[in-house]
């Protein structure tokens, strides 16, 4: 009788042990699944943030280029004045909104085109030259740049470079401001 009782206790223990092992497997699978999903979520967020950072960096370079090209127009005016030409220091820098683009090798290397405020066209990206431009020969991008010029007084203008772009489904914008002066007092 004792033997049967021991055998029954042993069988009950084995049954409990199998159920306990199944619970362990379920917990292990759950932990593994959570770990893998967390890894995928982390990778997805890293890839998204990388795209956002890359686009923000591109936008900041294009934005700075807009300010520098506007400064180049002012400096070209100074050079023309020094050569005896009759132009104002702020020639081609009238109040308004513009797109601005540099064309290497052309006689007038910087082109300002008037646009309605907030309506600047998107850039195209030329894979061969690695240059953003307004020509339709490259790939369309979501970047657009508006240069807003405001006269402060006879010797000062405010230049705002306003970048707008979209990364995936989120709209971004970035604005920098600079002041250009008639520092040569022409």
Task: Annotate each PLM feature.
Residues 1-20:
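N-terminal leader/signal peptides at the extreme start of proteins
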Residues 4-6, 40, 49, 53, ...:
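Short amphipathic alpha-helical leader/targeting segments
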Residues 61, 67-186:
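Low-complexity, Gly/Pro-rich coil/beta segments used as flexible assembly/activation regions
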Residues 4-5, 14, 33-34, 43-44, ...:
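Short secondary-structure boundary micro-motifs
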Residues 10-11, 57, 67:
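Intrinsic structural disorder/low-complexity segments
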Residues 20-64, 77:
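Aliphatic-rich helix starts adjacent to a transmembrane/signal segment
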């Amino acid at each position: 009788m004792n033997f049967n009782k021991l055998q029954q206790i042993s069988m009950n223990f084995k049954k409990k042990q199998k159920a306990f092992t199944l619970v362990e497997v379920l917990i292990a699978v759950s932990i593994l699944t959570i770990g893998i999903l967390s890894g995928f979520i982390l990778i997805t967020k890293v890839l998204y943030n990388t795209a956002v950072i890359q686009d923000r960096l591109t936008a900041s370079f294009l934005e700075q280029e807009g300010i520098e090209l506007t400064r180049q127009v002012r400096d070209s005016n100074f050079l023309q004045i020094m050569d005896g030409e009759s132009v104002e220091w702020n020639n081609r820098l009238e109040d308004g909104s513009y797109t601005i683009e540099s064309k290497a090798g052309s006689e007038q290397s910087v082109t300002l085109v008037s646009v309605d405020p907030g309506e600047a066209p998107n850039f195209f990206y030329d894979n061969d030259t690695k240059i953003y431009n307004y020509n339709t020969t490259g790939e369309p991008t979501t970047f657009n740049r508006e240069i807003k010029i405001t006269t402060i007084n006879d010797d000062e203008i405010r230049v705002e470079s306003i970048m707008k772009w979209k990364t995936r489904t989120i709209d971004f914008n970035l604005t920098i401001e600079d002041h250009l002066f008639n520092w040569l007092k022409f």
